[in-house]
């Protein structure tokens, strides 16, 4: 089995959060390390605010509960809150938590201003990596907004999108394969695996990329 270094960066674009994956990055690159540090600094404050918001909804001690699921407190996320809420009986599963409490616009959601798309792509590229838009099917953009996102991403030096991912349905595999063809993107796969039972698919069960698309990792492996 072969491995690549990687990073996933949260980005604010058109008032929504998207994720940009960097593959084959140099983890010691100064620009990347400093950029990630700035991004992490806002994560803890947001998590505390989410805990306060959930308390107003009758879910006390959520921040402390979420921390029990975190190996690195600097990396606390909504998923850790979701695990606490499922374990504590407030929801049936992680998706139920996001649908009812923590998804965009839901009563426990707290917005955060993440990095700019241009900054994230720059950090990835100067560290020797290639930028990939992660699981585009998760983002609630209009077709016009998606076209603008993809065009800007290309202008900034972005190379690929995730086509086959645990966050996509089979119909979305086909949809984003067509996007890759239309924009000339290379393609990537990602399980988006966080824990057993939390996603649509388990590790090792994703189908391959369509044979006519170029895998982004071919240049390294």
Segments from the language model and where they lie:
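Charged catalytic cores and adjacent phosphate/nucleic-acid-binding surfaces used
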Residues: 1-28, 36-39, 92, 115-133, ...
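Mid-domain alpha/beta scaffold segments of enzyme catalytic cores
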Residues: 1-45, 49-71, 75-80
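Exposed alpha-helical structural elements
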Residues: 31, 65, 80, 96-97, ...
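Divalent metal-binding pocket/active-site signature
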Residues: 44-52, 57-144
């Amino acid at each position: 089995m072969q491995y690549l270094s990687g990073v996933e960066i949260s980005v604010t674009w058109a008032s929504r959060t998207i994720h940009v994956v960097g593959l084959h990055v140099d983890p010691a690159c100064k620009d990347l390390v400093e950029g990630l540090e700035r991004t992490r600094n806002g994560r803890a404050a947001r998590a505390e605010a989410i805990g306060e918001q959930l308390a107003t909804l009758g879910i006390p001690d959520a921040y402390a509960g979420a921390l029990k699921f975190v190996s690195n407190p600097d990396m606390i996320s909504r998923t850790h809150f979701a695990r606490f809420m499922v374990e504590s009986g407030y929801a049936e599963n992680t998706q139920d938590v996001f649908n009812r409490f923590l998804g965009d616009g839901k009563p426990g959601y707290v917005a955060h201003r993440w990095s700019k798309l241009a900054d994230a792509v720059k950090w990835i590229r100067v560290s020797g990596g290639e930028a990939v838009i992660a699981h585009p099917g998760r983002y609630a953009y209009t077709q016009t907004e998606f076209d603008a996102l993809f065009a800007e991403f290309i202008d900034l030096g972005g190379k690929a999108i995730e086509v086959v991912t645990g966050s996509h349905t089979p119909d979305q595999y086909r949809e984003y394969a067509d996007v890759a063809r239309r924009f000339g993107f290379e393609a990537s796969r990602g399980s988006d695996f966080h824990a057993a039972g939390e996603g649509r698919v388990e590790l090792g069960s994703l189908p391959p990329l369509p044979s006519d698309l170029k895998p982004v990792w071919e240049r390294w492996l």
